[in-house]
Amino acid sequence: MLQDKLLVIKCKCGNKDAMYRIYGKYKDFLLTLARGLTGEQELAEDIVHDVFVNFALSIKKFRLTGSLKGYLATCVSNLARDRIRTRIRQSAIIDLVMENDCESNNPSRKLIETEEIIKLRDALEQIPYEQREVILLHIKAGMKFREIAALQNQSLSTIHGRYRYGI
């Protein structure tokens, strides 16, 4: 956290290397989060890119009061939510696809894993976005319930409830 504050101060002074280091430090985490929330690699990359562009453009006014990781995760989550809402309004169809993590070379095993991923994706599409978001943040991004509660500005019991009902 102290290192993040120092990097932010350097960014405010125009140090491009500091911004690059922040990007390198958090991009994988934020990409995993965005991919889990949207289900699409390209959209996730766009969201993370836009978050960092906005962060860089507003760095002069930025004040780090908590965790930089938490702040950036909130930005990614909010932007992902906005993009999904925009899509729903525009097309009225949600086309969320989880990344296929099948790494098996065995064709029958790969088929089973693919079927399981399809079932999981279908199940996730059936639950409300708020529950899906909590489940993916906890399982896919590895965030603790307290972190999710802080990220979403909700009580811990609300987050536990969303997770429990979603599962």
Describe these PLM feature segments:
Residues 1, 90-117:
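Internal acidic/polar
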Residues 1-29, 36:
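N-terminal module of bacterial RNA polymerase sigma factors
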Residues 12-13, 50-67:
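Sigma70-family region 2
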Residues 23-41, 58, 124:
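Amphipathic, Lys/Arg- and hydrophobic-enriched alpha-helical face
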Residues 25-27, 36-37, 136-143, 153:
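Short helix-capping/turn signature of helix-turn-helix
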Residues 27, 31, 52, 128, ...:
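C-terminal flanking helix
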Residues 60-64, 74-94, 113:
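Arg/Lys-rich amphipathic alpha helix in sigma70-family domain 2
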Residues 77, 81, 131, 140, ...:
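DNA-recognition helix of helix-turn-helix
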